[in-house]
Amino acid sequence: MQRRFDAAAGTFDSADFVFATTRDGLLARLEPISIDARYIIDLGSATGSAGRSLERRFKRAHILAVDLSQEMLQKARTKKTWLSKTAFLRADATALPFSDHSIDVVFANQLLPWMPDSAPVFAEISRVLRKDGLFLFATLGPDSLRGLRHQPFADMHDVGDALLGAGLRDPVLDVDRLKVTYENTASLVDDFCAIGARHCIPDEIEEMGLEPELDLEIIYGHCWGGGQRSAGGEYRVAAGEIGLRSR
């Protein structure tokens, strides 16, 4: 995965429409939340576009842009203004180099679809997040990319269960739908290549006779640090403990 993103660093911004859409959706959901933040992780920061918005929202905070791809981080550095307090760090989302309970906000825009298992990511976020710290994320739901990929994405309730099992509390989730239409299949393939995701669509896509469009189910969520982590790999939760955001 690191090699794919390194290769895509120079083209990512030209095809980041979905990332930009969900980034704006996350920032809109962040707006009414009141939290005093000193240290914020932009987890899976890619070329750093979210960091600039987070700096405007949290003017006194230090933004820590974390990504597995050194080339993505280098691209992000070129966007940094001289007044920026953003630091750039190459690290794995499942092994963050931060002390326990030292982070106020973790912002993760479309990181989870790239992870084979969300549980280690949630566990690590739970570890570094302070009590009453905020985890805010966007990911893809199971109705995304139907007909184009074989690996299913987790549904909203599975995501909520996994958050609670990792020791994150009071999750609130909502779902949005997004359709992206292309001029032709070749344009769709070009965009997937540009963001390092060519492996997500079949090699024979141009012979499949599919419409050149993407239907995406977007899951937005936020939750808080300081919950009880489950033991023994099992967690049971009443459906009412997973909040659904009013639309």
Where are these regions (language model features)?
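Conserved alpha-helix/loop element of class I SAM-dependent methyltransferases that forms part
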Residues: 18-37, 53
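Class I SAM-dependent methyltransferase SAM/SAH-binding core
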Residues: 39-95
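A short SAM/SAH-binding and catalytic strip from SAM-dependent methyltransferases
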Residues: 104-117
